[in-house]
């Protein structure tokens, strides 16, 4: 696990984008993408670059269950707004949180990932150590699955909604085994509230109680953090 300390989120986005360019130069064609406030500066770098994404495939980590794609808090909307409207990809996959049969959707998404192995995966980390929507206690063997979101995750995401009652209670998420199958993982974390999770991920025991700790077992992980997120590291 390589740790790169940066001054702020802006620099973090630039460093992540430079790592992406290196991966693309080595033949990467499929990107695993994340949502939320953490990767926004990475997407800004991508949008402002002259990079042609028309031959690339993207696979998103997760999507809320039951949120229409036109809702500005759906991850489908987020990806179009932050990236796809400006940089169309050859193919862009997201879980369908409106599927009538969620179990069939889970199987479909696992098939998508199997057919498009991820070369470069962007991750954030939750305050409770979740990656994607893989909450504490999720099996490391899990592939795509329907998740009941924990209260801490609902609370953390409520700032994006008019009311905490509007936050979806479930999501479809790529599983930990799916994430670990990525050839390279770049995890971004900024801010003091991520410091405890970063400490556990980097130096704590590998435990399903802190999902991100599994990344210690991956042989190509780069962690990009600001000083606040790094503040509990030795």
Swiss-Prot record:
GO terms, biological process: carbohydrate metabolic process; glucosamine catabolic process; N-acetylglucosamine catabolic process; N-acetylneuraminate catabolic process
NCBIfam families: nagB
Entry keyword Hydrolase: yes
Known function: Catalyzes the reversible isomerization-deamination of glucosamine 6-phosphate (GlcN6P) to form fructose 6-phosphate (Fru6P) and ammonium ion.
Name assigned to this protein: Glucosamine-6-phosphate deaminase
Organism: Streptococcus equi subsp. equi (strain 4047)
Pathway: Amino-sugar metabolism; N-acetylneuraminate degradation; D-fructose 6-phosphate from N-acetylneuraminate: step 5/5
InterPro entries assigned: Glc/Gal-6P_isomerase, Glucosamine6P_isomerase, Glucosamine6P_isomerase_CS, NagB/RpiA_transferase-like
Gene (name only): nagB
Protein family: Belongs to the glucosamine/galactosamine-6-phosphate isomerase family. NagB subfamily.
């Amino acid at each position: 696990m390589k740790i790169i300390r940066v001054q702020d989120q802006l620099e973090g986005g630039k460093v992540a984008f430079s790592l992406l360019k290196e991966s693309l130069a080595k033949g990467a064609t499929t990107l695993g993408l994340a949502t939320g406030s953490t990767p926004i500066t990475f997407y800004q770098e991508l949008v402002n670059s002259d990079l042609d994404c028309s031959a690339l495939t993207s696979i998103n980590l997760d999507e809320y269950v039951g949120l229409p794609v036109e809702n500005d808090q759906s991850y489908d909307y987020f990806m179009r707004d932050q990236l796809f409207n400006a940089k169309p990809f050859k193919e862009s996959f997201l879980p369908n949180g409106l599927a009538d049969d969620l179990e069939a959707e889970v199987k479909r998404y696992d098939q998508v990932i199997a057919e498009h192995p991820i070369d470069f995966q962007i991750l954030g980390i939750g305050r409770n150590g979740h990656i994607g929507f893989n909450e504490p206690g999720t099996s490391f063997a899990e592939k795509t699955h329907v998740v009941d979101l924990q209260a801490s995750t609902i609370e953390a995401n409520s700032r994006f909604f008019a009311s905490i009652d509007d936050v979806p209670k479930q999501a479809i998420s790529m599983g930990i085994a799916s994430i670990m199958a990525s050839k390279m993982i770049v995890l971004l974390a900024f801010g003091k509230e991520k410091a405890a999770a970063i400490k556990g991920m980097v130096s704590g025991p590998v435990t399903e109680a802190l999902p991100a700790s599994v990344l210690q077992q991956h042989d190509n992980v780069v962690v990009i953090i600001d000083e606040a997120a790094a503040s509990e590291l030795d």
